[in-house]
Regions:
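Classical nucleotidyltransferase
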Residues: 1-60, 151-164, 168
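Phosphate/ribose-recognition catalytic cores of enzymes acting on nucleotide-derived substrates
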Residues: 50-176
Length: 176
């Protein structure tokens, strides 16, 4: 048996631990979580039907099943990646599928406070510059790269649309 020393994050006196990673994610600090994990924090789940509000606003989203695997970061809007593994079969990716596809995304985590009919916290990803893709029933990974902003309730649909458009620009810039 070899004795190992604690792993410390560069520039930090604190020992790297799952507690620290969970605290960072709860605060929406995906950059710290990435440094601690050595990879971007992510979730995996099946794309399910939502209220289709994103599509109505001009920003269609892939909604993750509420039982997705992984730790959900704090409420807010994030830049990240959606990795499509293809159609699910019994909750897992189907075998012998063609290549995996990776798309830049603006990701919303929260209960969409502008609207009162959102029953629970959601994770939904808008694929940047792609509108004609059907991901329903596909297994996807959502990787969180950078937090763009916190969740905000808007006074109507028009201010929300303007903000989402800005979020998409900022997400695109964060991912280049």
């Amino acid at each position: 048996v070899d004795e190992m020393t604690d792993v410390r994050s560069p520039g930090a006196e604190r020992r790297v631990s799952s507690t620290w990673v969970r605290e960072a994610l709860a605060a929406g600090d995906v950059e710290t979580a990435t440094a601690l994990l050595g990879r971007a924090p992510s979730m995996r789940g099946e794309v399910v039907h939502g209220l289709k509000r994103g599509r109505e606003l001009g920003f269609p989203t892939a909604n993750l099943d509420p039982d997705a695997e992984g730790v959900i970061p704090g409420d807010g809007v994030y830049a990240g990646w959606l990795i499509d593994h293809g159609p699910s079969v019994g909750g897992a990716s189907a075998p012998n599928l063609p290549e995996v596809h990776r798309y830049p995304a603006a990701i919303s985590v929260g209960d969409n406070p502008t609207f009162i009919d959102v029953p629970r916290r959601q994770v939904e990803a808008h694929i940047i510059d792609v509108t004609d893709i059907d991901l329903y029933g596909h297994t996807v990974d959502i990787q969180f790269v950078e937090r763009i902003r916190g969740m905000v309730a808007y006074e109507g649909v028009e201010p929300l649309i303007r903000q989402i458009a800005d979020d998409v620009v900022r997400a695109r810039e964060a991912l280049v």
